[in-house]
């Protein structure tokens, strides 16, 4: 398995289907301290997904699997 990735979107919010494809399953919304949002796999720990060090540092909490950061117009409302 490859290392988990962190992708940032600023142009437009992803659809639910796009977000699910990116994180590989059910989506969990994590609010970041700067007001941005991070989407992660809600069941990542159950699936044994690998630690995402970069996303964990950004979120200041343990994040596994792929993460999608939403900024500006890309935020979910």
Language-model features: locations:
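Detector for the mature cores of small, proteolytically processed
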Residues: 1-77
């Amino acid at each position: 398995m490859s290392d988990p990735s962190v992708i940032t979107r600023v142009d437009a919010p992803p659809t639910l289907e796009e977000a699910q494809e990116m994180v590989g399953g059910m989506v969990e919304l994590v609010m970041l301290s700067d007001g941005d949002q991070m989407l992660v796999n809600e069941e990542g720990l159950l699936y044994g997904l690998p630690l995402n060090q970069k996303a964990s540092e950004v979120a200041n909490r343990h994040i596994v699997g792929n993460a999608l950061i939403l900024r500006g117009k890309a935020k979910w409302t």
